Amino acid sequence: MAMQMQLEANADTSVEEESFGPQPISRLEQCGISANDVKKLEEAGFHTVEAVAYAPKKELINIKGISEAKADKILAEAAKLVPMGFTTATEFHQRRSEIIQITTGSKELDKLLQGGIETGSITEMFGEFRTGKTQICHTLAVTCQLPIDRGGGEGKAMYIDTEGTFRPERLLAVAERYGLSGSDVLDNVAYARGFNTDHQTQLLYQASAMMVESRYALLIVDSATALYRTDYSGRGELSARQMHLARFLRMLLRLADEFGVAVVITNQVVAQVDGAAMFTADPKKPIGGNIIAHASTTRLYLRKGRGETRICKVYDSPCLPEAEAMFAINADGVGDAKD
C-alpha cells in the first residue's frame, strides 16, 4: 500500500514538473468538468486554467450555459491546479530572482531599470511626441527574441498598434545590429492594428489564445490610450471611459500574470492648464488618471534632450529609485547617447 502511495506521489510530481508555465484549459476535462463546459469557457476567452482560477465567479456565471453550481465546481477544480494561497517571502524572493529582464538596447537605460524591461508586469512609457516611445517599442520587439544570456526573452513579440506607427523596416535595422535573420525576426512578431476601444480589448482575447499556442515574451500596446481620447469625449463620458480603460488594463495585467510576458504600454500626455501649472517646471501629466497609474508597475517619463538624445526618468516604481538616464535614437534602434 505504501509502495502504491509512493508511486502515486511520484506520478503527481512528474505531472507538476510537466505543467511548468500556463496550463491549457483542456486540463479541466481530466478533473471531471465536461468537454462541453470547457468549450464554453474557451469561447468566452478563457484559454488557460490560470485564467479561470483568477476570474471572479460573477464573470463565469455570465457565460451562457454556466450555472452558479457549475461555476463553483469549475473554480474549485481550477484552484486545485493553480497555487493561489499564501507562500513565504523566501519562496517569493526566489521566484522574483528568476524573472527575466529584456534589454532596451541602451546600456544606460538598462542600468536605470536594473537590467531592462521586467517580464510578468506592466511597464508604461509616457511623454510628448518624438520622445522615443515607439522607437523603444520597435527595439524591444527584436531584443525580446534574443537568447536570455544576451539580454533577451527567447520568445516572440506581439504588437498592438492603435496609431498606425508600426514600421517593419525599423525591426529589420535592429535585427541587423544584433546579427539576427531579418525574415525570422519579422515572422516572430504578431502585429494587429486596433481601430477602436472595443476592438483593442477584443484583440487581447485573441492574444491569450495565441500565447497558449507558442511562447511569447513581450506584448506591446502603442498607444494604450490614444483611442480612448477619441472614442470618449467630454466629462459626461469620463466615468464610462475610465471603467472601460480599467477593464482593458486588468486584462493586460492578467496576461502578464498568466503567461509571464513583459507588457509595455505607451501613453500620451496632456498639458495642465490649471492654476497649479504656473508653479511646476514641466506642466505635463500622463492621461488616464489614477486608473492607469495604479495598473502600471513601472512608469517611465520620456522627454527630449539635445539633438537625437532623449532622457528617461523613473516616474513611479515599487523598487527602482527615482533617477534619470540618457539614450539616443539611432538608425539601428535605441542605443547609448554619445558624449
UniProtKB/Swiss-Prot annotation:
Q: Give start and end of each HhH domain.
A: 48-77
Subcellular localization(s) per the UniProt record: Nucleus; Cytoplasm; Cytoplasm, Perinuclear region; Mitochondrion matrix
Q: Which SMART domains match?
A: AAA (SM00382)
Q: Which SUPFAM superfamilies match?
A: P-loop containing nucleoside triphosphate hydrolases (SSF52540), Rad51 N-terminal domain-like (SSF47794)
Q: What is its main location?
A: nucleus
Q: How is it modified after translation?
A: Ubiquitinated by the SCF(FBH1) E3 ubiquitin ligase complex, regulating RAD51 subcellular location and preventing its association with DNA. Ubiquitinated by RFWD3 in response to DNA damage: ubiquitination leads to degradation by the proteasome, promoting homologous recombination.
One GO BP annotation here?
cellular response to ionizing radiation
Kindly list the GO molecular function terms attached to this UniProt entry: ATP binding; ATP hydrolysis activity; ATP-dependent DNA damage sensor activity; DNA strand exchange activity; double-stranded DNA binding; single-stranded DNA binding; single-stranded DNA helicase activity
Q: Which domain of life is it from?
A: Eukaryota
Any Pfam family from its record, for instance, is HHH_5
Give the modified residues of type Phosphothreonine.
13, 309
**Which residues does UniProt call coiled coil?**
none
Q: Where are the Phosphotyrosine modifications?
A: 54
Q: Can you locate the Glycyl lysine isopeptide (Lys-Gly) (interchain with G-Cter in ubiquitin) cross-link? A: 58, 64
Which keywords annotate this record?
Acetylation, ATP-binding, Chromosome, Cytoplasm, Cytoskeleton, DNA damage, DNA recombination, DNA repair, DNA-binding, Isopeptide bond, Mitochondrion, Nucleotide-binding, Nucleus, Phosphoprotein, Ubl conjugation
In this chain, where does the modification Phosphoserine occur? 14
Name the InterPro entries on file. Answer: AAA+_ATPase, DNA_recomb/repair_Rad51, DNA_recomb/repair_Rad51_C, DNA_recomb/repair_RecA-like, DNA_repair_Rad51/TF_NusA_a-hlx, P-loop_NTPase, RecA_ATP-bd, RecA_monomer-monomer_interface
Which family is annotated? Belongs to the RecA family. RAD51 subfamily.
Identify the NCBIfam families for this entry: PRK04301.1, recomb_RAD51
Subunit and interaction comment: Forms linear homooligomers, giving rise to a RAD51 nucleoprotein filament, which is essential for strand-pairing reactions during DNA recombination. Interacts with BRCA1 and either directly or indirectly with p53. Interacts with XRCC3, RAD54L and RAD54B. Interacts with the BCDX2 subcomplex RAD51C:RAD51B. Component of the homologous recombination repair (HR) complex composed of ERCC5/XPG, BRCA2, PALB2, DSS1 and RAD51. Interacts directly with PALB2 which may serve as a scaffold for a HR complex containing PALB2, BRCA2, RAD51C, RAD51 and XRCC3. Interacts with RAD51AP1 and RAD51AP2.
Q: What is the protein name for this chain?
A: DNA repair protein RAD51 homolog 1
Organism whose genome encodes this protein: Cricetulus griseus (Chinese hamster)
* Gene this protein is translated from: RAD51
